[in-house]
Amino acid sequence: MEERYSEYGDIFRTNSNSLFPFIYFCNPKAIQQIFTADPDTFTSGGTNGILQYYVGRNSLLLQDGDRHKRQKKLLMPPFHGDRMRKYGDLIYNITSNVISHWKIEQPFPIRKLTQEISLKVILRAVFGLDQQGKSYEKLRVLMSDLLDSMSSPLSSTFLFFNFLRKDWGPWSPWGRFLRKKQELHELIIAEIQTAKKEGNHRDDILSLLLEARDEAGNAMSDEEIKDELLTMLFAGHETTASALAWALYWIDMIPSVGEKLMAELATIPSNSDQVAITKLPYLSAICQETLRIYPIAMNAFPRVVQKPIEIMGYQLEPGMVAIVPIYLTHHREDIYPEPKKFKPERFLERQFSPYEYLPFGGGSRRCIGSAFALFEMKLVLATILSQWELKLLPNQRISPVRRGLTMAPPANMRMVVKPKKSWQKVSQPILTSG
């Protein structure tokens, strides 16, 4: 896509396998028009049809119109307000527990570490599951297996071609996928039933969804809740893990970045809580720059034109597909000078509009878990780096690989744990209670 952008500029088209062309808009003015257009101008849920095999047909990602509005309102409360403080305790405790088992000078794959942390956080936050329980271990294994099935173009080929989606038994790729998915669905339905029996004694996201009511006073069905929980698991685990791994990579790769971050962490008063940690300017800038240079997804969700609209002089007709390329927008030289360089300072020097910086998409389709994802990133990084120093092993060739929908670091990217000198340590940077 970078070649097409270099050749054709802000607006270019590609011929896809569909009947209508895909039109890419890289200019912030065009992006603003798309994100703020009348809701009836575009639909997006139908273009995500391939995701139904993972998240189910009731997922917010697959909805449009009034149904999308209803689901989004029902799902918003767990990701805002005072809930964040409770998540802070959870994130800190899980991260502290994981890194307490580290061995000095012993190399390890960093992506595996961040996957472990993010999966434990999401399972605890969503289901209230303790890692010692059987349900936790079953969910962990099933999630890992299903994510592996979409981790590369080769392994996920069957999703794109109908003739490959044939169940020839448990040893065939599609048959194995279907059985793993069914196991996961049954396990989640069982957790929903357990949560119903336990009533108000829980504080996880599942319990909040059971209590949620729309404007007519109706609750979500078990199938709707199941599919939304699946969406949270798939959208919130691998994406955060990849972003964390990239952040740790850049912090060590550019020594001045790590030095500035440590200096900032050292200024934290001993009585600070988790929310105060997440407001640190340079820590925030590091997370923002990480998501700029390697965004969670290459493109925002495609939008299918439903009625004629003109975008920067380009006439779109019904059936055409408008795409906002996040990666290309984040690498515009006129917005981000030296876009291939990791420079957190750019986020301290100016504020970017939501049409220039859009790691979580935009408009009505913006990711509802964006605040949670950033909150988790900041707390995990602060917890780790206030106590330990992580160094990349030398002579590694690091380049992004596809992992589901994300641009992840390679699985073999390895780091080593080194103890901090006494003057480098931050004394109790995050409290264990909000």
Show where each model-derived region lies.
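Cytochrome P450 heme-thiolate "Cys pocket" and heme-binding signature region
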Residues: 70, 230, 235, 274-275, ...
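Cytochrome P450 I-helix active-site segment
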Residues: 88-92, 138-146, 200-207, 250-297, ...
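C-terminal domain-closing interface element
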Residues: 169-173, 283-299, 303, 410-434
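Cytochrome P450 catalytic-core helices
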Residues: 239-264, 371-386
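Conserved cytochrome P450 K-helix/beta-meander segment immediately N-terminal to the heme-binding cysteine loop
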Residues: 324-350, 426, 431
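Cytochrome P450 heme-thiolate monooxygenase catalytic core
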Residues: 43-52, 67, 83-242, 260, ...
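N-terminal membrane-proximal hinge/A-helix region immediately C-terminal to the signal-anchor transmembrane segment
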Residues: 1-70, 85, 89-97, 180, ...
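Cytochrome P450 proximal C-terminal region
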Residues: 5, 95, 99, 141-144, ...
